[in-house]
């Protein structure tokens, strides 16, 4: 191996002696490169007067640059970021285009099936008592004709037209109802006249007046006191859980009920049937059969619902003593004659009582148990559309009870029957609409001759509403 002497090195220390070192070939080459590079003097770095990108680094060899890293300017970083963003977007687009469309979710099918099962569940009706056969519900209620009220059975009012009396009473009826309902019965207070039978009268009084808390109420109630005590009960043969006794002003009933004089007449017909009639042996169910007839129903057809029938009975008249007059004793108790009022549906008598004392108030909300402002068909449908058939049948039973009471009392005001018919059409229409929706029938498929009933219009309106909800 050859041995070289180290060449002279130019440095700042020129006066220092160069040592004699024996070098190998590799060491000599490495030392030569280092000494050659060390002799290169870089020019002075100029100061930048203003902001800028600066000067790019100067390279001679990757390992021997004047800076230990590659300079990355702001423009370079911006370009690099733009390229990366573009590549990410292109990859996402390719990935999105290559993805397959998602299959139909089974959850949607389950939702449709659960909705169908829920509709079937709501369409079930469980009557409180077994009903033999099928229950036929008419699309409209029959409207029987009632006799006109010719006079008021009162010695001071016989010569005055009934309509005139009623028109003068209409503004006073709400206050009469408030006062009469404030009277409470006191069964332990005897009648001041010992000759009066005990069970023929009943003592009433306003508790706040009797105990002295509000004695001024007695002056306000003067002229509007009740004159009759009604024991509201089921008709004979239908059972009863107890009668409801309420004090009333008989004039409010006498001016609006065609059959009211039957309760106060001195001669009461007692039927003696020749043979049992089919109506007498029929068993009453939760929803008795109602035969749908034309509107011009005769009085004879209605007489079958009363407690006697002139065609099949021998009527015997017996004279009964006239009802005792109302008397107020010295303690402030009002002794009223007690009269039993047998009606088909005592549970719906409060609706009748309120309607007779508030004739200008809408009856439709009371019939369906809705707030007072629900007076149109659209509002009623909004309220009852979500009810089940079980709940709708309960409302239908209430409506039928009101219908029976109207027929029994002889209330024939046209406005009353129109509102009852509208309530009946709304409830029956929703029940029929549920059947149409379950069966999948379309309105165009139904062939019909003649005019639609109100219940049919409600049924198809309900179906259209439900289909619109399903599409949302």
UniProtKB/Swiss-Prot annotation:
Glycoprotein as UniProt keyword: yes
The entry's keywords: Glycoprotein
Source organism superkingdom: Eukaryota
Glycosylation sites: 70, 296
Disruption phenotype: Expression is not seen in haploid cells where both copies of the gene are deleted and there is no discernible phenotype with respect to haplotype growth in strains with complete deletions. However, there is a complete absence of sexual development and strains fail to form dikaryotic filaments/spores. Where only a single copy is present in a wild-type and mutant mating pair sexual development is indistinguishable from a wild-type mating pair. Expression is up-regulated during sexual development.
One of the GO biological process terms: sporocarp development involved in sexual reproduction
Signal peptide (from-to): none
Summary of the function given for this chain in its UniProt record: Required for developmental progression after cells of opposite mating types fuse with one another, essential for processes common to both dikaryotic filament formation and monokaryotic fruiting. A direct target for transcription factors Sxi1-alpha and Sxi2-a.
Full protein name: Clampless protein 1
Organism in which the protein naturally occurs: Cryptococcus neoformans var. neoformans serotype D (strain JEC21 / ATCC MYA-565)
Organism taxonomic ancestry: Eukaryota, Fungi, Dikarya, Basidiomycota, Agaricomycotina
């Amino acid at each position: 191996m050859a041995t070289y002497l180290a060449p002279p090195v130019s440095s700042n220390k020129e006066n220092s002696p160069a040592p004699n070192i024996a070098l190998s070939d590799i060491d000599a080459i490495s030392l030569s490169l280092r000494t050659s590079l060390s002799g290169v003097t870089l020019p002075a770095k100029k100061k930048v007067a203003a902001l800028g990108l600066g000067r790019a680094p100067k390279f001679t060899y990757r390992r021997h640059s004047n800076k230990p890293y590659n300079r990355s300017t702001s423009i370079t970083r911006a370009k690099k970021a733009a390229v990366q963003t573009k590549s990410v977007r292109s990859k996402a687009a390719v990935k999105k285009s290559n993805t397959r469309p998602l299959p139909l979710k089974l959850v949607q099918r389950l939702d449709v099936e659960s909705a169908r099962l829920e509709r079937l569940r709501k369409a079930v009706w469980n009557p409180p008592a077994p009903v033999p056969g099928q229950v036929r519900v008419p699309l409209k209620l029959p409207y029987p004709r009632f006799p006109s009220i010719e006079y008021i059975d009162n010695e001071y009012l016989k010569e005055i037209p009934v309509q005139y009396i009623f028109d003068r009473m209409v503004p006073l009826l709400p206050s009469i109802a408030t006062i009469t309902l404030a009277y409470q019965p006191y069964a332990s207070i005897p009648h001041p006249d010992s000759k009066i039978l005990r069970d023929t009268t009943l003592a009433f009084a306003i508790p706040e007046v009797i105990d002295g808390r509000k004695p001024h109420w007695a002056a306000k109630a003067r002229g509007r006191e009740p004159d009759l005590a009604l024991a509201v009960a089921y008709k004979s043969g239908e059972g009863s859980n107890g009668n409801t006794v309420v004090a009333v002003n008989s004039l409010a009933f006498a001016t609006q009920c065609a059959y009211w004089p039957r309760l106060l007449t001195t001669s009461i017909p007692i039927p003696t049937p020749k043979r049992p009639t089919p109506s007498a042996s029929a068993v009453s169910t939760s929803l008795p059969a109602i035969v749908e007839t034309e509107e011009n129903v005769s009085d004879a057809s209605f007489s079958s619902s009363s407690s006697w029938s002139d065609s099949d009975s021998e009527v015997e008249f017996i004279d009964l003593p006239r009802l005792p007059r109302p008397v107020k004793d010295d303690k402030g108790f009002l002794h009223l004659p007690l009269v039993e009022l047998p009606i088909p549906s005592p549970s719906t008598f409060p609706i009748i009582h309120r309607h007779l004392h508030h004739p200008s108030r809408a009856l439709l909300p009371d019939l369906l148990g809705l707030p007072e402002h629900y007076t149109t068909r659209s509002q009623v449908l909004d309220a009852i559309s979500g009810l089940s058939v079980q709940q709708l049948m309960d409302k239908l039973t209430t409506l039928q009870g009101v219908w029976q009471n109207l027929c029994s009392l002889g209330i024939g005001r046209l406005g009353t029957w129109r509102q009852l018919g509208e309530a009946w059409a709304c409830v029956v229409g929703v029940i029929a609409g549920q059947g149409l929706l379950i069966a999948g029938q379309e309105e165009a498929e139904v062939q019909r001759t003649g005019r639609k009933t109100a219940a049919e219009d409600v049924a198809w309106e309900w179906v259209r509403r439900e289909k619109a909800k399903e599409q949302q």
